[in-house]
Amino acid sequence: NILRKWEKNNHYQAILKHHKGQPSFILHDGPPYANGNLHAGTAMNRSIKDFIVRSHAMLGYYTPFFPGWDTHGLPIENAIQKLGVDRKSISVAEFRRKCEEFAHSQITTQMETEKRLGQIADYEHPYISLQKEFEGRQIRTFANMALKGMIFQGLKPVYWSPFNETAGAGSENI
């Protein structure tokens, strides 16, 4: 099968090695939530990114692509509650641990699906928003922005969901 051949021949690394030293093309991956199997929209999104990265490799660019996963947030909490976890009957720490375990299991599932779809990326070094290194980089970036005077305090509405007992992201409040 083609996938096994690509893995055996380390196809992705061979492409990178071939273009080492050439101008880089970096596509930053806006990550999907790790809250279940890939759905059609996420599969299409990742396939388009794969097409863009590969086409730039064919043009001679060095094209490292690090897939990412968002492992925080309400979609993951909702997914494990649908599996029967009652967040009110366990501690916050236990609920968060269950969310983290679930998210990591979904990353593995989604990663394997992407590989079966023929996508290539550095699956050995994905970025995952729950990784301490990732969280640390976010804090350092925020600190640098604050030192440059880019952070300010102001007023804006916070849309609260009494059903979910959490604030919703702006894009969720349409």
PLM feature spans:
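N-terminal, positively charged nucleic-acid-binding surface of large information/translation enzymes
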Residues: 1-174
